[in-house]
C-alpha cells in the first residue's frame, strides 16, 4: 500500500517511523580507525538473556523492541542459524556494542543489528565497529551489504551510514504498537517519540 500525499493519522497507542534502507554494492575504502582499546568477540549460539540484555542496553532509547517481543523459540532459531553471526564490541571487559551479520540471502549480507551503548556514543566506537562489520561482510562472497535505519534512531545514524559508504535505495513507513504501553520498554525511554494513549 502506498500512503497518499498529505497527513495520515496514526491511532493512539501506535508509533510510526520512516525507515530508510541503505546498501553498498562494492567494498568501500574504510575510514581510518579511531583511537580506542576496543575488541570484537564473536558470540556463537548466544544465550537469549545475554542477547536481550545487550540489545536493550544498545537500543532501548531508540525504541528497539522487535527482539524483545519475539518469542523465545523464534529468537533462538534466528540467533542460532548457521548463516547468522553475532558479535559483541568489548570495552574494558564488558560487552558494549552489538553487531549482527545475516548471510542468509544469496550473495548478500544484511547488517541486522548495529549499535553501541550510550556510554560509547560519540567515542568513535561505532565507527570502529562499522569498520569491523564491513571487513567481515566483504571477506565473504557477497555482492551487496545492506541495512536499515529509522527516524527513531540516533539523529546521527543516517549520516553515519552514508559516510560509511551506504546509499539509500528504499523508504517505508513502519507502524507498530508502542512498546512502552505494554511493558516491552520502560515508559520513560525515547522521549523524542511521545507516548499517545
Predicted features and spans:
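Acyl-donor-binding surface of acyltransferase catalytic domains
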Residues: 1-39, 44
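Acidic/histidine-enriched, glycine/proline-rich intrinsically disordered or flexible terminal extensions
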Residues: 2-17, 175-197
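Conserved active-site alpha-helix within GNAT-family acetyltransferase domains
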Residues: 3-8, 152-171, 178
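Short amphipathic alpha-helix that is part of the acyltransferase structural core
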Residues: 34-66, 187
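A conserved beta-strand-loop-helix scaffold within acyl/acetyltransferase catalytic domains
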Residues: 66-73, 79-118
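Conserved glycine-rich acetyl-CoA-binding loop
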Residues: 117-131, 140, 152-156
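Conserved beta-strand-loop-alpha-helix junction that forms the acyl-donor binding cleft
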Residues: 121, 147-157, 174-180, 184
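Conserved GNAT acetyl-CoA-binding A-motif
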Residues: 137-149
Amino acid at each position: 500500500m502506498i500512503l497518499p500525499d498529505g497527513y495520515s493519522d496514526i491511532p493512539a497507542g501506535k508509533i510510526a517511523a520512516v525507515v530508510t534502507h541503505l546498501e553498498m554494492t562494492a567494498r568501500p575504502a574504510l575510514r581510518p580507525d579511531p583511537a580506542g582499546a576496543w575488541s570484537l568477540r564473536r558470540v556463537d549460539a548466544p544465550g537469549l538473556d545475554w542477547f536481550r540484555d545487550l540489545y536493550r542496553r544498545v537500543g532501548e532509547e531508540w525504541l528497539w523492541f522487535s527482539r524483545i517481543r519475539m518469542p523465545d523459540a523464534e529468537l533462538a532459531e534466528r540467533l542460532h542459524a548457521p548463516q547468522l553471526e553475532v558479535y559483541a564490541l568489548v570495552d574494558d571487559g564488558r560487552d558494549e556494542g552489538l553487531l549482527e551479520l545475516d548471510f542468509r540471502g544469496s550473495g548478500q549480507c544484511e547488517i541486522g543489528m548495529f549499535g553501541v551503548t550510550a556510554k560509547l556514543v560519540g567515542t568513535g566506537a561505532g565507527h570502529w565497529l562499522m569498520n569491523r562489520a564491513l571487513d567481515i561482510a566483504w571477506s565473504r562472497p557477497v555482492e551487496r551489504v545492506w541495512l536499515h535505519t529509522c527516524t527513531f534512531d540516533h539523529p546521527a545514524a543516517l549520516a553515519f551510514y552514508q559516510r560509511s559508504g551506504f546509499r539509500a535505495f528504499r523508504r517505508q513507513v513502519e507502524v507498530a504498537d508502542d512498546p512502552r504501553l505494554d511493558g516491552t520498554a520502560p515508559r520513560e525511554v525515547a522521549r523524542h517519540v511521545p507516548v499517545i494513549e
